[in-house]
């Protein structure tokens, strides 16, 4: 059907390209409908691996699609599926990818935003493997603009969860396996494009949600995603990964029991599914088939099976390569009964990868800045190695300065000499209150002088304020009354200080009360006493009874009673007896 559409529309497409601009608006709706059907036919041939590259036919189709996009009103009739099919068919072509790329860059993505959002929200479309392939190519290429519209991962995960449940009920369903495979690839590709914070959020959601817990294998089966999560280095994320790995192993062990029973491997040897589960928990790198084969070779003895895994002594007749794993890439060619051919939308050519410079589809590892340096390859000469601080070059100050540095220094010196003195603020009155106590030897006298000066200022300002409060307004700066006030204060305050005093006097009740009390009663600052603090001085007065020199010493304590003194005993030699000579 698609071959008939393409062959019959070749002449029509070439004629539509030569239609004059004045007649084009009447022909544009029919041309838009024709190009949509033609692109759909190209996509069907691409899926079946029967697309025959014809440079002239493809080029005419690209030019006609470009002309329809530039026509007002035709863009509304072109849907997101047609745009994605155009991308998948012609951007992967080895001959016309440059023309297709130029057309895709001109698509107004802002006008297509609502259509793409509405299309991706239809979750039933993602149960079709062909639609998942189409969106997968769209996600990898990102050709329209920097603002690319992706299907929401939150909408794709429930569909994948339902497909996994269907596969558990009917493991022999090849259609469900194919849909699950391509939908899983689409979700993994979207996760690759997401940020680190988004990736952690999806991991938490998969672990916390009971309905989506069976989709956790999407993260752990992709080595790049798993390594990316481990590289984040957060201890909480590592704990989440450990918890997710335990859940994933439980899922694998749960599937193993049903898989062993369905394949009938335990007919020869009675194998307990619990032993298979225990062996997989001990050795997570084993698949279900390998665990069953080790148990079969060990006659169901789990200890002997563990020993065979450690020593890798599996018999040749029980090689695991003869069995197929549970979740593998479905054989699409056998389902459609077609010869084995590479499906075009699944691989990007080198020319397309060169055009799409922002994303690389074959990037397996995350490279760093210092990955291919000399230190990594150990290509450092011994002359560059040193201990502690780098040794100083003794001939550094003997070297001549480059001419560029000399000219730059001379220019800076010339600019510094040519700069004139700035006398803008020389004529301004910079007088202000001066603390007369600074540098005085007597701090008490300086404090009293400052207090008297402040009292004089408060009294003067208070008197002027009682006579005419308008003198303190900002508008009265050039008035005669303000000039008299400044003369009275001997220009010790500025206009701003005078106006600020009035603002404090009217708003701060404590300050106003203190000023009134000081002016009225002259009490001044309560922190400073009315009398100066005197220092203690040694008196020269001597009592007359001490002048005659008859002063006697008065003991500090009474003398001891002589009768209470201890007796001193003197040790005497004993007298000799009379019979001793």
Swiss-Prot record:
UniProt keyword annotations, A-Z: Cytoplasm, Nucleus, Phosphoprotein, Ubl conjugation pathway
Boundaries of every CUE domain copy: 271-314
Molecular function as annotated in GO: ubiquitin binding
Chain positions with Phosphotyrosine modification: 386
SMART domains xrefs: CUE
TM region positions: none
PROSITE patterns for this protein: CUE
Start and end residues of each stretch annotated as Disordered: 422-448, 522-581
UniProt-listed CDD domains: CUE_Cue1p_like (cd14424)
Biological function: Involved in activation of the ribosome quality control (RQC) pathway, a pathway that degrades nascent peptide chains during problematic translation. Specifically recognizes and binds RPS20/uS10 ubiquitinated by HEL2, promoting recruitment of the RQT (ribosome quality control trigger) complex on stalled ribosomes, followed by disassembly of stalled ribosomes.
UniProt remark on domains: The CUE domain specifically binds RPS20/uS10 ubiquitinated by HEL2.
Protein name: CUE domain-containing protein 3
Organism: Schizosaccharomyces pombe (strain 972 / ATCC 24843)
């Amino acid at each position: 059907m698609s071959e008939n559409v393409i062959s019959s529309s070749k002449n029509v497409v070439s004629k539509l390209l030569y239609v004059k601009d004045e007649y084009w608006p009447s022909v544009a709706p029919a041309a838009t409908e024709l190009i949509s059907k033609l692109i759909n036919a190209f996509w069907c041939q691409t899926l079946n691996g029967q697309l025959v590259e014809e440079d002239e036919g493809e080029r005419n189709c690209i030019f006609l699609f470009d002309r329809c996009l530039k026509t007002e009103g035709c863009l509304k009739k072109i849907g997101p599926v047609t745009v994605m099919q155009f991308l998948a068919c012609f951007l992967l072509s080895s001959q016309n990818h440059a023309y297709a790329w130029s057309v895709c860059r001109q698509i107004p993505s802002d006008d297509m935003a609502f259509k793409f959002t509405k299309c991706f929200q239809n979750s039933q479309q993602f149960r079709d493997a062909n639609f998942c392939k189409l969106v997968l190519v769209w996600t990898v290429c990102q050709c329209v603009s920097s603002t690319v519209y992706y299907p929401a991962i939150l909408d794709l995960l429930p569909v994948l969860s339902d497909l996994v449940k269907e596969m558990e009920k009917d493991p022999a369903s090849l259609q469900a396996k194919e849909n699950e495979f391509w939908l899983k690839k689409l979700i993994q590709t979207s996760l690759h494009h997401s940020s680190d914070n988004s990736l952690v959020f999806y991991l938490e959601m998969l672990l916390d949600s009971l309905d989506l817990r069976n989709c956790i294998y999407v993260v752990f089966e992709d080595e790049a995603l798993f390594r990316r999560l481990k590289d984040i280095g957060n201890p909480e994320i590592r704990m989440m990964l450990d918890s997710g790995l335990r859940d994933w192993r439980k899922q694998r062990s749960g599937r193993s029991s049903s898989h062993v029973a369905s394949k009938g491997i335990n007919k020869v040897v009675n194998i307990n599914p619990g032993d298979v589960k225990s062996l997989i928990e001990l050795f997570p790198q084993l698949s279900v088939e390998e665990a069953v084969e080790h148990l079969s070779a060990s006659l169901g003895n789990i200890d002997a099976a563990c020993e065979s895994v450690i020593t890798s002594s599996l018999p040749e007749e029980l090689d695991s390569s003869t069995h197929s794993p549970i979740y593998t890439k479905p054989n699409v060619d056998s389902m459609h009964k077609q010869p084995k051919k590479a499906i075009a939308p699944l691989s990007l050519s080198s020319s397309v990868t060169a055009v799409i410079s922002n994303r690389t589809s074959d990037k397996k590892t995350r490279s760093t800045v210092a990955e291919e340096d000399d230190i990594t390859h150990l290509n450092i000469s011994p002359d560059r190695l040193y201990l502690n601080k780098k040794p100083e070059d003794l001939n550094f100050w003997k070297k001549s300065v480059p001419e560029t540095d000399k000219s730059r220094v001379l220019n800076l010196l010339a600019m510094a000499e040519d700069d004139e003195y700035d006398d803008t603020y020389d004529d301004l009155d910079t007088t202000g209150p001066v603390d007369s106590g600074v540098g005085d030897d007597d701090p008490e006298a300086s404090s009293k002088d400052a207090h008297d000066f402040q009292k004089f200022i408060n009294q003067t300002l208070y008197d002027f304020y009682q006579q005419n409060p308008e003198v303190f307004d900002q508008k009265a700066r050039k008035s005669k009354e303000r000039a008299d006030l400044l003369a009275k204060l001997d220009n010790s305050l500025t206009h701003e200080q005078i106006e600020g005093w009035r603002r404090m006097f009217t708003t701060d009740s404590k300050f106003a009360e203190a000023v009134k009390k000081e002016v009225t009663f002259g009490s001044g600052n309560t922190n400073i006493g009315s009398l100066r603090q005197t220092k203690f001085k040694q008196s020269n007065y001597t009592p007359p009874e001490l002048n005659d020199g008859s002063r006697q010493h008065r003991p500090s304590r009474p003398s001891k009673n002589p009768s209470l003194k201890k007796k001193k005993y003197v040790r005497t030699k004993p007298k000799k007896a009379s019979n001793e000579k």
